[in-house]
A protein has these predicted regions:
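Nucleic-acid endonuclease domains
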Residues: 1-71, 76-502
């Protein structure tokens, strides 16, 4: 039967759009028929969906070459999933863009590299992944044609910078030191099962783990929302700054803040008066220093590269005055998360890179902007966060318990408080779960609370003080919102070498 000819990218795209609504079951059956007619072997694993579309739908043999899938049309086909969760539309995984050939890649010129040759013109077919639904029932829902040279100029520069950074590692004989965390949009993702396999690429240099070019999951999420849903306008973290090939984005972030190190918060508030008093005050000052119109975490670069901003105020011993919080979690959604690396906690706490801006007091007792750093959780601590995630899921599954205790409010009046059985700070010394809301709420659903699918067990005191005997007792139907936190003592150890004396 042989390959069907596609001379133009328009032909390929038209055929791709005709696949919308056809189930994977149909595609796999067509693929199997094509393979039988052409004496081809069926491929198993993550790539089999792409192979099934190429062979079954496009009648075109899958290739592993360093050139586009459709040579004459000069276009590379990708089939990738998105999902919908409490945070909206998200890419389910990174987009693999082919094996990194340490030995044979043209590391001297980006536009002549194997990466560029194969991926400069992409046709991306998106399907929705739904947990619990058989894969055979999925179908392509959206098709996007992406030319790298037509992406926003800032995206182009960052992608090229990432590629050139990979090239520098390889040419210096340091391919074995490559890490996804050091790249913004285009990363050298681990390829294969994640074992100890290593490849030799030069007799002089250490062997390196096999890797593939990949667009990060955070980049694909933002790309999907911008191009497929057109839900949001683009704003930049550094709108007035020209990104330079020889400078890291991380370095530019820190250099922009440097002139303000040692300045008092009061003087910064006078210079940057558009701030909200209270919790967001320091974040707003930092945003204005960067001349960003939006909150930094809503900007293009921060979302595509999965950066987070956190301002940390430390005491005289260098300990942050508060733990480091993340978004309140959905109890039912957390329980449905079976895969750790696809969880919201992993995305927010492990897969994120943090711009930490430190505030302290100077010798006069004035609060100042002390320093800033780029940080991500050390690999040795990742499993400790995973343990907290697993324990939180276990608590929800086995039953939340609310233990009644006695305390005093600010006026000194005796009150009831309720302690839950989620993992506390002594569980891992790295992360924990506790209330997210400013005020506790156990009697109704409002901005501070959630309604539980399975009511909590309320354990009351054996003896109730006389003045509290008429106080209502929760039914367990409602509970104060909860979130994951990095412990402040843990964060003290992470930032201790960056705190300056003023």
């Amino acid at each position: 039967m042989g390959n069907k000819e596609y001379k133009t990218s328009e032909e390929v795209k038209q055929r791709a759009e005709e696949a919308i609504g056809h189930s994977f079951k149909e595609i796999f059956e067509l693929s199997q028929k094509y393979q039988q007619e052409n004496g081809l072997k069926e491929k198993h694993g993550k790539g089999d969906i792409g192979q099934a579309y190429e062979e079954g739908w496009f009648n075109y043999a899958c290739n592993e070459e360093a050139e586009p899938d459709f040579k004459d049309a000069d276009i590379e086909l990708k089939v990738t999933p998105f999902l919908i969760n409490s945070r909206g539309y998200r890419a389910k995984e990174r987009l693999s863009l082919g094996k990194i050939n340490y030995r044979d890649e043209n590391w001297n010129k980006y536009e002549e590299s194997r990466f560029w040759t194969k991926n400069h013109h992409l046709l991306v077919m998106y399907y929705q992944y739904i947990k619990g639904v058989k894969r055979e029932k999925f179908s392509v829902e959206k098709v996007d044609e992406i030319l790298l040279e037509e992406l926003p100029e800032r995206d182009q520069m960052i992608i090229q910078h990432d590629w050139e950074k990979i090239a520098r590692y390889v040419k210096a004989g340091k391919a074995h030191e490559l890490s996804e965390r050091d790249f913004m949009y285009l990363s050298p993702a681990r390829k294969g099962s994640g074992g100890d396999e290593k490849v030799k690429y030069n007799d002089k240099y250490p062997k390196a783990k096999p890797r593939a070019y990949s667009f990060k999951k955070s980049y694909m999420t933002k790309l999907f929302n911008e191009r497929m849903l057109t839900l949001e306008e683009i704003s930049y973290a550094l709108p007035g700054t020209v990104l330079l090939k020889e400078k890291e984005f991380d370095d530019i972030l820190i250099e922009t803040l440097k002139p303000y190190f040692g300045r008092t918060v009061e003087s910064l508030k006078n210079e940057f008066p558009n701030y909200r008093s209270g919790y967001s005050e320091k974040n707003d000052i930092v945003k204005q220093i960067y001349k960003s119109e939006n909150d930094l975490e809503e900007t293009d670069e921060f979302q595509k590269a999965n950066y987070k901003l956190r301002t940390l105020t430390v005491d005289e011993k260098g300990t942050p005055t508060q733990d480091m919080s993340f978004s309140a979690f959905d109890f039912d959604g957390l329980l449905k998360e079976k895969n750790w690396t696809e969880s919201i906690v992993y995305d927010e706490m492990v897969d994120s890179k943090f711009l930490l801006v430190i505030f302290s007091k100077n010798a006069k007792g004035q609060e100042i902007l002390n320093n800033a750093l780029i940080w991500y959780i050390p690999k040795k601590d990742v499993n400790k966060v995973k343990d907290v995630w697993k324990e939180a899921r276990k608590v929800i599954k086995n039953g939340i318990k609310l233990q009644q205790k006695l305390s005093h409010n600010k006026a000194g009046r005796l009150i009831f408080v309720y302690k839950n059985n989620f993992p506390k700070s002594n569980f891992s010394k790295v992360a924990h779960v506790r209330n997210k809301a400013g005020e506790s709420e156990y009697f109704c659903e409002n901005a501070n609370s959630v309604k539980l699918k399975n009511p909590a067990e309320v354990i009351t005191l054996k003896e109730i003080p006389e003045e509290l005997k008429d106080t209502p007792i929760p039914t367990g139907e409602y509970m104060t919102k909860q979130c994951f936190w990095f412990d402040k003592k843990y964060m003290k150890q992470q930032i201790k070498n960056f705190i300056k004396l003023y």
